Amino acid sequence: MNELVNDNLYETRNNLVKEITLLSDTEFNRKPDMDMWSIAQVCHHLVLVEEASIKAIAWGLKGNDRTSTERKNIHLTLLDRTKKIKAPKIVDPDAAPFEVPQLIDLLNDSREKLLAFLSTIEDKAILKEKSVKHPALGELPLDQWIEQIYLHEQRHIEQIKEIKLLLDVKH
């Protein structure tokens, strides 16, 4: 994994944790609307997406074929919040309430699993040569599966900021 991707994973996760650390559990779990997720649910969704991404990359690596596909401008899709993307059921968050420290632990655990998994890949070049279909982005090279983790997280940090405004949360 190149240094820029690693830095982006680190910086984005730090920004996410800064957004949620000072929230009370009530603020964390309050939904601004019945049809919207709470901040806790957004964070749980991010954990589930990171874990699902590990599985997708692992599955792609097991395939014998070099299924190289064109690189996509995934940032255009993921960072454009005017384009709504319906989450697949497998990454739908729990409705049960969470405590802020509990979810920070889950976020840390999923990131540790991701980094540990990536460290087992001896030849990182293979990540550009194989691909797996992403539910929202289509056929995606495995290295872009890693990029989509932090881009997707950046998208949801903006959503968290919007939810905080709707809930009139000051921190």
Regions found by a protein language model. Name each.
Residues 6, 10, 43, 47, ...:
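Short amphipathic alpha-helical segments with heptad-repeat character
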Residues 13-21, 50-54, 58, 111-122, ...:
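Structural signal for well-ordered, non-membrane alpha-helices
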Residues 21-33, 90-98, 112-145:
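Acidic interhelical loop/turn segments
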